[in-house]
Regions:
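Membrane-embedded multi-pass helical conduit in multi-pass membrane proteins
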Residues: 30-32, 312-395
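A conserved acidic beta->alpha catalytic loop
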Residues: 91-102, 116-119, 152
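Short aromatic/hydrophobic "clamp" motif used to bind/position activated sugar donors
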Residues: 144
């Protein structure tokens, strides 16, 4: 076999992988532009508004690991909900926080739990909270809400949730940046909004389940309490997604209910966060793969889609990898006199589609020169992400903490 044929085979295989990733991004970016239908949920779970005789009750969980800098402000802010006080209860799972912080929290009208885990994780915190609440309270809740320690929500957060919550579906609220104090934080916020367009809004627009994002999540209490003990990794949101998809529970994305979330503002924090995500993505893919044949046979489109999501190349790496391969293909085509129209032009066309897809996914209010100029830090961040690949451990269940300060 000649060198030219080997090069063409490698080129084609690489292009298939990259083009598949690009098509996924472009397809759901375009889907996010579709008008919001009055009836966006599957017919089996169309919500009937609550009657006046019953208003939903909520258990609100704040897992907090080394979150002394932000947790008190978040809890005090949340307690200003305009929802009836007797219909919601806040529980903070304080893990490795100071005595001073715990004393302050204990003075508030909440439940403070202080577990002592050998190895901390958000999943363990949620499991501990549900176990304690179910054993020590006679209250029956309709829904459980999961928020991060740095999250800030509007006073009508629970009121708005109560209008759409349904036992047969999970809800993912619109998590958005509460800080953009430097280029890294701004870029992290931009990345999250692109994800919202592609993995949440775009999916819901065509009747598919949204992706979860780790906080701003709402579940039926009975479902959550029955499934939370199945969580066994450092990326509980991906595990929850898999459980929901296997059980046919729809995830509804609510764009109008905002959850303000602190974005990482340092390269070290960015690297830690992305390492956790990349490790979790690989772990989730390996966990979901065995059930994929059954999903294909039964036509479980949402489970198939979620499995594909775990196999996607991280977008910022793809943004650097694709033009690099374009240049390599162009040089190789010139050196070996390969037919350009079937060799390097397909790469440039794929890159153009990728850029178009990303641009479409950026909310219109963020398409400014100021925001786009902040992308100058991207090469440094991509390099950090690339080095993370060397540290991915498929069996590692250790929690990688992201520091919050705002």
């Amino acid at each position: 076999m000649s060198i030219r044929i080997i090069i063409e085979i490698i080129d084609f295989l690489l292009w298939i992988i990259i083009a598949g990733n690009v098509f996924y991004v472009l397809f759901f970016a375009l889907a996010s532009l579709l008008p919001k239908k009055k009836k966006t949920l599957p017919s089996s779970i169309i919500h009937q508004p609550s009657t006046l005789s019953h208003r939903s009750s909520f258990l609100v969980l704040f897992p907090a690991y080394h979150e002394d800098a932000v947790i008190i402000h978040s809890i005090e802010s949340f307690l200003h909900q305009d929802y009836p006080r007797e219909l919601y209860h806040v529980a903070v799972i304080s893990d490795n926080m100071s005595e001073e912080t715990n004393q302050h929290l204990a003075s508030l009208p909440i439940t403070l739990l202080c577990p002592n885990f050998e190895k901390s994780s958000k999943a363990k915190a949620l499991q501990h909270a549900i176990s304690f609440i179910s054993q020590h309270t006679s209250s029956a809740y309709d829904y459980v809400v999961v928020l991060d320690a740095d999250n800030i929500v509007a006073p009508d957060f629970l009121t708005q949730l109560s209008k759409i919550a349904h036992p047969s579906m999970a809800i993912q609220c619109h998590r958005t940046a509460k800080n953009a104090d430097n280029d890294i934080a701004a870029l992290d916020g931009l990345s999250e909004e692109i994800n919202n367009s592609i993995f949440r809004k775009g999916h819901n627009r065509i009747g598919m389940s949204s992706a979860l994002i780790g906080s701003g999540m709402c579940f039926d209490y009975n479902w959550f309490s029955s499934n939370v003990n199945k969580l066994d990794s450092a990326v509980e949101d991906r595990e929850l997604e898999a459980l929901l998809m296997m059980q046919g529970v729809h995830i509804h994305y609510v764009e109008d209910i905002l959850v303000m979330d602190e974005k990482v503002s340092s390269t070290d924090n960015f690297q830690r966060q992305r390492l956790r995500w990349m490790t979790g993505q690989v772990q989730a893919f390996l966990q979901m793969l065995p059930s994929l044949p059954k999903a294909i046979i039964t036509g479980n489109i949402n489970y198939i889609d979620k499995t594909i999501q775990q196999a996607l190349i991280p977008r910022s790496i793809l943004l650097v990898l694709t033009p690099t391969l374009c240049i390599i293909a162009t040089l190789t085509s010139s050196i070996y006199h390969l037919p350009s129209i079937i060799y390097h032009l397909k790469w440039w066309f794929t890159l153009a589609l990728f850029i178009i897809g990303l641009y479409i996914a950026i909310p219109s209010q963020m398409r400014t020169k100021v925001v786009l100029k902040k992308a100058t830090v991207l090469p440094r961040l991509v390099w950090r992400m690339a080095t993370n690949i060397l540290h991915i451990k498929t069996s590692n269940k250790e929690f990688i903490h992201t520091v919050h300060n705002k």
